[in-house]
């Protein structure tokens, strides 16, 4: 088993960055992004078995459904790459069996290595209250799973931290694993980079959970130059249905594909349906400028020119930006 520290370094290497992204996308169930992350990881040199081990380990932190969905996605990715003639490296063989007399003791000692602290039997508090969960943690997670040396302890903690950082409401466990990660050689600089990757793949809010724990400045959720705009549009009646179809497609693509588009919410007046109102919210001015150059917006713009009778753009200022993150949260 490979539990040794690695030499401290300032940055995550490309393979480590891929492990972060794969773990994050798995944890939140974003299979579309996961497919991209898996391809990128293989291209960066992660072996098939390294990725299998990471996805298998993640069931302990984000559940069997997320883990199984990710593994099925990985199988699809490998099949597609094979059909294109891409030969990926299997890597070190995965050892499935773990034949030891006392798995609890094996897991307890592994946990002592990771935490650098004595681990009593049963674990105080939780282990006494729910002995079976204590047994599962020691005998399965820290014995059966961690016994495989396909991933180092440091890589395993990078996987775990990335997953927990992507899930809301698990700050206590994230704190514990960040401490363990540091024991395996993960540095604050690498955790800062990990947080930046989580911000890209999940949100600023989740990335800030890591930054807060390691004492780094939090990134503001709402940018000072956030743009809020109301578009007042009157449509030529004969084009109304065609316009609504194009607008619906453009709004959906913008929200799904552009991280800087917080909302594009089209509406029309009930008594006068040719009067369209669109609430547009952009993270910042750069996001708005980027939006204007996207293919879906350009298609919308050129396709609807003849349909628009009048257009009035009204830039707004929010009275309370701190409540912006609560918009639409109740619609689930």
Predicted feature residues:
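Acidic, glycine/proline-rich low-complexity segments that act as flexible tails and inter-domain linkers
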Residues: 4-16, 27-43, 49-50, 64-153, ...
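N-terminal targeting signals for Sec/Tat export/insertion, comprising classic cleavable signal peptides
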Residues: 10-32, 233-245
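Short, structured motif recognition centered on aromatic/hydrophobic residues
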Residues: 17-25, 51-55, 155-165, 194-198, ...
């Amino acid at each position: 088993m490979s539990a040794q520290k690695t030499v401290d370094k300032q940055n995550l290497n490309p393979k480590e960055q891929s492990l972060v992204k794969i773990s994050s996308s798995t944890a939140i169930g974003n299979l579309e992004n996961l497919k991209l992350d898996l391809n990128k990881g293989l291209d960066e040199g992660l072996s098939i078995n390294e990725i299998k081990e990471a996805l298998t380990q993640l069931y302990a932190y984000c559940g069997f459904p997320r883990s199984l969905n990710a593994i099925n996605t990985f199988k699809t990715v490998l099949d597609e790459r094979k059909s294109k003639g891409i030969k990926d490296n299997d890597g070190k063989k995965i050892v499935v069996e773990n034949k030891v007399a006392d798995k609890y003791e094996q897991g307890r000692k592994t946990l002592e290595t990771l935490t650098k602290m004595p681990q009593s039997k049963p674990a105080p508090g939780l282990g006494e209250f729910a002995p079976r969960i204590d047994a599962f943690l020691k005998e399965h997670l820290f014995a059966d799973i961690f016994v495989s040396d396909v991933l180092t302890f440091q890589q395993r903690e990078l996987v775990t931290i990335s997953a927990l950082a992507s899930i809301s409401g698990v700050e206590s466990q994230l704190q514990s694993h960040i401490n363990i990660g540091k024991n395996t050689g993960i540095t604050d600089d690498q955790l800062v980079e990990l947080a930046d990757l989580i911000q890209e793949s999940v949100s600023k809010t989740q990335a800030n959970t890591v930054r807060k724990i390691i004492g780094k400045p939090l990134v503001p959720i709402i940018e000072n130059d956030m743009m809020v705009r109301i578009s007042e549009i009157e449509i030529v009646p004969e084009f109304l249905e065609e316009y609504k179809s194009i607008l619906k497609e453009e709004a959906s693509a913008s929200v799904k594909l552009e991280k800087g588009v917080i909302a594009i919410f089209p509406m029309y007046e009930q008594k006068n349906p040719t009067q369209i109102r669109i609430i547009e919210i952009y993270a910042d001015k750069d996001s708005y400028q980027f939006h204007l150059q996207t293919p879906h917006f350009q298609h919308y713009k050129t396709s609807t020119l003849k349909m628009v009778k009048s257009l009035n753009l009204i830039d707004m200022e929010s009275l309370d930006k701190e409540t912006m993150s609560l918009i639409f949260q109740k619609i689930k």
